[in-house]
Amino acid sequence: MMKIGVSTLFFWEYPMVEIFDIFRDIGIKCMEFFPENPDFWDNRFDLDYIADLRKEFLKFDVALHNPHIELNPSSLNPYVREAVIKETLWSIELAKFYRCKLITIHPGKRPTNRSPTDEEYEAFFKYLDRTLEVAINKNITICVENMPERINRIGWSPEEMEWILKRYDELLYMTLDFAHAKEYMEEFLESVIDYIKHTHISGVVNRKDHFPLRKSEIDFSPYIKALLDYGYNGMFNLELDDRRLEKNPVTKEEKIEEVIKDIEFLESII
């Protein structure tokens, strides 16, 4: 059976308790939780708030997305790298508390518009070494996400993702972002399908990501079917961006309608 989830970040402007209600009303049983949702982020050090949400999280199948805004695990600035490690270790503890079995992380990038150097890769590998050491002890699976194709990004090509994953074989896994992959989807499935434990899915319009899936100019349905046929039993997580919709602001009811239509579209594929 296809497991369909939705990113909490699509409903970023609402309190977490309201997001839980929205998901329940729609009938969603899976979610990808972004701690950087403003309501949660503003209360992240309030232990009573954190504890009160636990009973709600336990009602869902939850994957966690590591904080990434303003962060870069491949930074050559040691203070930035230290911040990334602190946030990641905090996320691992949070995932354990909320019984999330999986965390998605981003690879790094070179801050200038040039190809990453050996130093950026080395910084990223040191970050992975520390992250995996802690996560494995906590029985948390770490999945690195493929990035959009940019000259300064680590991990956008199938070849590079395969190289990274094989370096940490049986320790590190992958979150496959369909919209980031675009025309490389077939190559990703050919080279790293055994590592895929989680997915992000959305539509691509004019080469831009995170549109409603049903409006995508790239037909991802063959790859969805291929994953399912291969035995993939992870989440297909809708990662939509309200800025890609045709109006601003977008009401809660309009967002709910977009999610319902995309869920129906996904279900129609199989």
Curated annotation (Swiss-Prot):
Domain of life of the organism encoding this protein: Archaea
InterPro entries reported for this sequence: IolE/XylAMocC-like, Xyl_isomerase-like_sf, Xyl_isomerase-like_TIM-brl
Pfam family, one: AP_endonuc_2
Protein name: Uncharacterized protein MJ1188
Lineage: Archaea, Methanobacteriati, Methanobacteriota, Methanomada group, Methanococci
